Design a protein with these regions (language model features):
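Long, contiguous bundles of hydrophobic transmembrane helices that form the permeation core
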Residues: 2-17, 30-37, 41, 45-48, ...
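Central hydrophobic cores of alpha-helical transmembrane segments
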Residues: 29-37, 162-169
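Alpha-helical transmembrane segments and, especially, the helix-loop junctions at the ends
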Residues: 127-144, 149, 154-197, 207-216
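Membrane-helix interface "capping/anchor" motifs
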Residues: 19-29, 152-161, 293-295
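Hydrophobic alpha-helical transmembrane segments
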Residues: 1, 70-85, 197-209
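Short, amphipathic, aromatic/basic-enriched membrane-interface segments that mark the entry/exit
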Residues: 1-4, 107-115, 167-168, 241-244
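Membrane-embedded alpha-helical segments and adjacent helix-loop junctions characteristic
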Residues: 53-150, 295-296
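Membrane-interface helix termini and inter-helical loops of multi-pass transporters
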Residues: 49-71, 185-195, 264-272
């Protein structure tokens, strides 16, 4: 049994990857993959699958779905709210033309590189640097969706490739501000800075290079295979957007700037949550719109 369960996990992971490559609905694939693994843990290994504080129903089959309910409630109030806030902020940035202003300013010089996938790799490296000051993977992903995603689409990268890069930007939790790195340093009996410089960086740098190279070739291969990259970019450019001042391009970047300022790098005495940063900038932009147009 001790060998069977890990092997089952490997098989389910491979099958899930195959199903997603074959373009089966991702949510359904992940749901059933998780249910299979949880059911195996409950019925075959006799593991208590319920989180702390959740009372068992008396039947493991029901507890599987009680686990889903418990996780759903927790995620809806945490990551779920973050996704809704970031989605609303991104939609508002697009509606007022701020996202398009950012794309307009950045795309022209970036296109001179003559390779959208070089820009894609740079976006990945920027995201990985930002994770050192914004250690929340979900928070960083939402901020990059607002600021980086439209730029990558504008230079001709497919939405799938852009999201793949954003999704892996927080793949390595680097730096002394990371909770994982701090825990590892504590267990090892090292200062977090020493742990970061002497132990994390020697492993992280070659890993970053390897992932960046893989992104370049893998995303380019699948974009060419899908043959939808430039068609999508044309649709983005052709979409009618409001005419706004050039300085509106700053607004999508402001939440990231605020998160960097109110971090251990600059002002460590004040902490700013990702959602709070989004709402703060949102309110500021509404006030600017009221002054400029007398309409939000």
């Amino acid at each position: 049994m001790s060998i069977f369960l890990p092997m089952l996990g490997v098989v389910v992971t491979i099958l899930a990857g195959w199903a997603m490559i074959r373009r089966y609905q991702t949510h359904i694939v992940l749901l059933f993959s998780g249910l299979i693994l949880v059911a195996a843990a409950a019925f075959l290994a006799g593991v208590d699958i319920l989180p702390k504080g959740v009372k068992p129903s008396g039947f493991a089959g029901f507890d599987i779905f009680n686990l889903l309910v418990s996780i759903g409630k927790k995620q809806a109030s945490g990551i779920g709210f973050l996704i809704m806030a970031a989605g609303g902020f991104a939609a508002y940035m697009e509606r007022i033309g701020a996202a398009n202003a950012l794309v307009r300013i950045t795309v022209s010089p970036l296109r001179k590189l003559n390779s959208p996938y070089i820009v894609l790799v740079l976006g990945y490296l920027i995201g990985q640097l930002l994770v050192m000051v914004i250690p929340s993977a979900a928070g960083l992903a939402m901020l990059l969706l607002v600021a980086l995603y439209p730029i990558l689409k504008g230079v001709g990268v497919s939405p799938a490739a852009a999201v793949a890069v954003i999704g892996t930007s927080a793949g390595m939790t680097l730096g002394p501000s990371s909770g994982t790195a701090n825990l590892a340093a504590k267990v090892a009996g090292l200062d977090p800075i020493i742990y970061f410089v002497q132990y994390q960086l020697p492993v992280a740098i070659p890993t970053l290079i390897a992932v960046a190279v893989c992104h370049y070739f893998v995303q380019r291969y699948y974009d060419r295979k899908g043959d939808d990259v430039y068609q999508d970019a044309d649709q983005v450019q052709a979409k009618e957007v409001p005419s706004v001042p050039v300085w509106y391009a700053v607004f999508p970047l402001l939440p990231i700037a605020l998160m960097i300022i109110f971090s251990k790098l600059v002002i460590s005495t004040v902490k700013l949550d990702t959602i709070a940063a989004l709402f703060l900038v949102w309110v500021l932009v509404i006030l600017v719109e009221l002054i400029r147009l007398r309409s939000p």
